[in-house]
Amino acid sequence: MCGICCSVNFSAEHFSQDLREDLLYNLKQRGPNSSKQLFKSDVNYQCLFSGHVLHLRGVLTTQPVEDERGNVFLWNGEIFSGIKVEAEENDTQILFNYLSSCKNESEILSLFSEVQGPWSFIYYQASSHYLWFGRDFFGRRSLLWHFSNLGKSFCLSSVGTQTSGLANQWQEVPASGLFRIDLKSTAISRCIILQLYPWKYISRENIIEENVNSLSQISADLPAFVSVVANEAKLYLEKPVVPLNMMLPQAALETHCSNISNVPPTRETLQVFLTDVHIKEVIQQFIDVLSVAVKKRVLCLPRGENLTANEVSKMCDRKANVAILFSGGIDSMVIATLADRHIPLDEPIDLLNVAFIAEEKTMPTSFNKERNKQKNKCEISSEEFSKDDAAADDDSPDKHVSVPDRITGRAGLKELKAVSPSRIWNFVEINVSMEELQKLRRTRICHLIQPLDTVLDDSIGCAVWFASRGIGWLVAQDGVKSYQSSAKVVLTGIGADEQLAGYSRHRVRFQSHGLEGLNKEIMMELGRISSRNLGRDDRVIGDHGKEARFPFLDENVVSFLNSLPIWEKANLTLPRGIGEKLLLRLAAVELGLTASALLPKRAMQFGSRIAKMEKNNEKASDKCGRLQIISLENLSIEKETKL
């Protein structure tokens, strides 16, 4: 992962050959292993390229990279499939070599259509004065744009800065395809024209209508001197996943559990589905494709190849290379179980579990209430929860921490130990006080969440920032010790709910509009995931010099799930804890998981209790006053107090 930036100016007298201090600092946070800036000047324009690399594969390749013809490339991505990259090779250099050999725009589009994995990039094509940029189909890597001074300058960057309330603030580059700017003609006209090369399905006949709608939506958010137009050659990128299967059953579906609609969910209920040969086959196919996705994401990183045999034998001294955002819920449990298959057994796995602690919270009453509430919801026996959790609570660095995700996290840890007892599972208890939340939101997190600005963005953005930072406590047999995760790769379960009808709104839509309405809701979820979640989470996790990886959004996983009819993925006639994400729950049972396979969806902001920390009367969609733009006078203070 990297922090990449390109600042372009069409007015020489006002151009600085350096970035603002705060922007440079934010970029370096993302790429701590190397930094470099490159200045390119033409009669009509000046470009400053800035690259900051987090080294995760092959030979450390400093960015930006430049070839003998003056082409410049900045890459923030991972090639997991599509283009062959050997273990010792760096994908930045491999992709740049291919890109430099492209003879026309069609070849550039064909190249990026082949890449599977998360990416954003900036490419300066010197001979034609073109600047290309874009994000992958799902928008798994952040890229922002900022247009200022009535067309005199613009900037592209992985992360922005706080702009003190000025108009035309940073905005996310839409994950709509590739964009191209002709810098030479822009310098003359002072009107920035963005040519769009959109994603499309090759067989779709309505691509022109879709493209027109996309252009108008993008243009609506841009200044008057910036316009978005379809590329003149009508060329397109090929979408990397198959279309969503919108098929509806010709007759009423017969459920295997028609008599359980009002029965509390149990593991035995799920076992009934596993007697069906076809369902069992689909589950195994799902496990296989998801397992490969996890494997790519946990093995594609540098490990301690130079360790001595004596060092390797000291398992307790080994550092984790992979961490998982871990609530103990079904998504993180399945990811952890599959990661265990592929990560070397002598390597620990960090399970990052975050809880927000209100000062007034007291201990046993709230703990018992939460435990009983969870038990009632999921029909998990008190014996299954209480023995391990009570012991953990006795030794916890903060005995008052009994938020729902901590309780399910500890129970999930117990399950993982049963599935893989030889693995060292580092359950990292990350406890955040009101004071720490408010201080670091103000000085550090606020600008990472922006340009998103809702109460929901604030809650999830802050929770993910503290969780991925990985500073907390380990509760072990020999006592409690402070701990900071050194893992550079952070796995997250984003994408499971969107594809498998995991949200409560899916059940509401199904109840009002049936399977057809549910299909449309899922299509909408996947279509907007880049603008709702992924750019924000990439900025937040990347701020720690770590890389977010999303197994559920692997192109092959999405294509497999898209190919299935909706009733093989979810059955919302069944109760919570079974019907939503049914396919994933059945996969969890096949993988040997127990109580976690029945946990109903609980949003991170509620499970971690961040939603209860401040105002309780806010709606998730409200604009969040706590994210209001402030000046970065705190930057030097933040540097001094950074933990």
Swiss-Prot record:
Any one Gene Ontology molecular-function term assigned to this protein's record: asparagine synthase (glutamine-hydrolyzing) activity
Keywords tagged on the record: Amino-acid biosynthesis, Asparagine biosynthesis, Glutamine amidotransferase
All copies of domain Asparagine synthetase, residue ranges: 285-601
Stretches for region Disordered: 367-404
Matching InterPro entries: Asn_synthase, Asn_synthetase_domain, GATase_2_dom, Ntn_hydrolases_N, Rossmann-like_a/b/a_fold
Residues annotated as catalytic: 2 (for gatase activity)
Bias (Basic and acidic residues) ranges: 367-390
Biological process (GO), any one: asparagine biosynthetic process
Pfam families: Asn_synthase
The organism's place on the tree of life at top rank: Eukaryota
Glutamine amidotransferase type-2 domain segment(s): 2-184
PANTHER family: ASPARAGINE SYNTHETASE DOMAIN-CONTAINING PROTEIN 1
Protein name (record): Asparagine synthetase domain-containing protein 1
Organism (species): Macaca fascicularis
